[in-house]
C-alpha cells in the first residue's frame, strides 16, 4: 500500500524495475537502480545518527544524485531541506542553523562554497556525497556509500503525518521561513496533479525548477505517482533557451511545468520553429500571471500543446487549474480556475465575512495538500491560519490565508487580482519586498530605505530600492552592492538602486512608496 512518498519508488521498483525513473543528459536511472541507490544512502544516513524527524540538507545542482538524496532521506525517516546552491553563504548558514541540520548531502563542486558556509556555523556538519572534506567536517563519498551499504529497503516506522520536506521562502522580517509538508500533503498533491493533467507511465516530465522551488514537487512526485520519467534540465540549459528547446526535442519531453518567465524566454529566444516538438503535449505554468501577448505567441508556436494555468502557493501546493482554450489580444486576464474537488475556498473581506460573487476579497483555502505550518514560527502560524466553525459537526475547519486578492464568478471560477501584502514574484521566485528593505537599511551608512516594485511593459515585476545616507557620509555603492549580494538571492537584489536626499511622506509621516513607484514608472517611460 502506498501511503508514503518513497513508497512510489519502491512500488515501481517492484512492478516495473526497468522503467526509466530519471534522465540527466546522457545518464539515467531506472526505478530499480534509483531504489537501490537511495536505500544505500538511507542506510548510511541511519548509521550516521540520522533518525526519524531529523532534517537533512540537500545542497547540490539538479542531478541523478539529487533524486537519490530525496528518496534516501524519506526512507531514513527524515525530512529533506533543499538549499539554493546560488544563495549567499550567510543565507545557507542561517537556514542550516534554523533547521538544526547536522547532515548535508552535497557534491565536490560545492566544497569551495561550503567552506564559506562552514565558517558561519556553530558546529561542524557531516557531508555525504563528497570525496573532499573541509575543516572540522567529516565526509563520506558516493563510492564509499555504494560500496559499503545495503541495497535493501529500510523498515523505519513512518506515518503519513510525519514531516517529509521543508522549503524555505522569503520572510517579511528578513528571516527566511520554512514551509513544512508531510508525506500525506505531498502524496495527495502528487495524486491530484497527476490526475489533473492525465499523466501516464509513458510520459517524460521536464524538471526545470530547482529543488528549493515548490514546483519541483510536481516534477518528482507526480511523475513517480504514475511511474513516469523525470527529465532533469540542468541549470546551464535553463539559461540558454535555444539549448533548452533542443533538449526538449532530444529527450522527447511530453510535459513541462514551469514559470512564465522561462516560457517567454523559450518563445523569444528558443528558436522553436527549428525544433520538432510534436511529442510535447502539455505545458503548465504557475507562480505569476502570464503576459497575454507572450502567451498568444507561444500557443501559436506550439499548437499541439494544451496549456494550463496552475495556482497554489507553496503552503498549499496546487489547488486550482484552468485549461486555456481561447485567448485573444483583447484578453486582459486569465482565470486561475475552479478550486479542486479535494479543497474548499472562501473569499472574504477584512472581517472574514464572505463577499458576494464578483467582489474582491482574500482567498482562504482548506485542503489536504496544506502545510503543517512554518518551521519554528508559532507566532506566524497563528496569523496565517483561519479557523471556521463547522455548525454540523461542531469542528473547527482550518484554512490557509493566501494573501492573494481574488474574485469568484457565479460559475465558481476564481480570478487572481493581486497581492494583499508586499510579496511579489520575480522571474517566478517569491520575493518579500520587506525582506529586501530590511537588508538594505541594515547597511551601516544607510539611514532610511524603501523598496518597491513597478510593472514593466511585459507585465513582469522590477524591484527598485531607494535610500538616504546618514549625515555627510559618502556611501560606497560598490560596498553596498557587495553587501546585498552576500545576503540576498540574485533575483531579490533591486534592479534599480538610487540614493535620495529625502523621501516623500504620507500624512502619517510614513515613507510614501506609492509616490516612489509613480516616480519610477515615469522615469522608466
What are these regions (language model features)?
Residues 1-4, 104-122, 126-156, 186, ...:
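AMP-dependent adenylate-forming
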Residues 1-128, 135-166, 181, 188, ...:
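AMP-binding/adenylate-forming domain of the ANL superfamily
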Residues 2, 60-64, 78-97, 108-113, ...:
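ATP-dependent adenylate-forming carboxylate-activation enzymes
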Residues 60-63, 84, 163, 199, ...:
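Conserved AMP-binding
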Residues 77, 172, 227, 287, ...:
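Conserved G/P- and acidic residue-centered "switch" motifs that form tight phosphate/ATP-binding loops
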Residues 166-179:
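Conserved adenylation A10 loop of the ANL superfamily
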Residues 177-204, 214-254, 269:
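Conserved AMP-binding/adenylation subdomain of ANL enzymes
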Residues 225-228, 253-257, 267-335, 344:
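Gly/Ser/Thr-rich phosphate-binding loop
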